[in-house]
Regions:
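A short SAM/SAH-binding and catalytic strip from SAM-dependent methyltransferases
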Residues: 111-124
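C-terminal lobe and adjacent flexible extensions of AdoMet/dcAdoMet transferase-like proteins
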Residues: 192-205, 211-234
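A short glycine-rich, Lys/Arg-flanked "PGG" loop and its adjoining helix->strand segment in the class I
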Residues: 125-140
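Conserved class I S-adenosyl-L-methionine
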Residues: 1-45, 58, 62, 79-82, 140-168, ...
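Short alpha-helix
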Residues: 176-199
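Class I SAM-dependent methyltransferase SAM/SAH-binding core
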Residues: 48-52, 56-100
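A short acidic, Gly/Pro-enriched loop at the edge of an enzyme's catalytic core
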Residues: 102-112
Length: 234
């Protein structure tokens, strides 16, 4: 029987150290998701950036190097420990994306980033609404998530069903997330108070072909990977 909720367990805490090693130069993270999101973030010099569900701080480190003032949070205590060790010039807190950001005042952040995390939240509109609340007028949220077409091709059933998926990744990591059609994600974005400025279906950067030529060719022609959005507070 499929689960009907993702729940609140910090899934990545169990493999936080392994995930750092995997994501630092891994195909999907370093050569696919991060380049796309960093492009959408644009120039962050001097800006207050909120890194929501920051993982091991790979984005935070890059944003600090580009001149941003970064605050990050993650539900995994071990991920936050890793962040504090690796990125001492940023601030990090243990906090669940599903909870209100009650430690941040309204309109206190220039830009927010939420990379490959929103699908692990049961009430995505509430989480996105909180990110909107803390953005300054005209602020932007860069959001990435798994491409629903790729997940649907893997799991079958109706593309239009909204359902919880539990799967084991190739490193033996068990993860649970929401699979929903693109129209549902777009509706949730609008209900949370955002407009879509840009939507990209990223392709891997050219150097990724040296890591995995077959996967590079597949993602260069098929929508099986991620989506990335730049959203404006309305």
């Amino acid at each position: 029987m499929e689960p009907d909720r993702v729940g609140r367990e910090p899934q990545y805490d169990l493999f936080a150290d392994e995930f750092l090693d995997h994501a630092a130069d891994g195909f999907y993270n370093a050569h696919y998701d991060r380049p796309a999101c960093l492009d959408l973030l644009g120039d962050v010099r001097g800006k207050q950036v909120l890194d929501a569900a920051c993982g091991p701080g790979l984005y935070a480190a890059e944003l600090v190097s580009r001149g941003a003032q970064v605050t990050g949070f993650d539900a995994s205590p071990r991920m936050v420990e890793i962040c504090r060790e690796r990125v001492p010039d940023a601030e990090f807190l243990v906090h669940d994306l599903a909870d209100p950001l009650d430690w941040l005042p309204d309109g206190s952040v220039d830009v927010a980033l939420c990379a490959l995390a929103i699908e692990h939240v049961d009430d995505r509109v509430a989480a996105l609404s909180e990110l909107r609340r803390v953005l300054k007028p005209g602020g932007a949220l860069v959001l990435s998530r798994m491409h629903p077409t790729g997940d649907w091709l893997r799991h079958g059933g109706s593309y239009f069903d909204v359902r919880v998926i539990r799967e084991r990744w190739n490193k033996g990591w068990d993860v649970t997330y929401w699979l929903a059609p693109l129209e549902v994600t777009c509706r949730e974005i609008y209900e949370a108070g955002f407009l879509i400025e840009r939507l990209t279906e990223p392709r891997p950067v050219p150097g990724a072909a040296d890591l995995n030529a077959a996967e590079y060719e597949r993602l260069a022609r098929e929508p099986r990977g991620f989506l990335a959005f730049r959203l404006l507070k309305r």
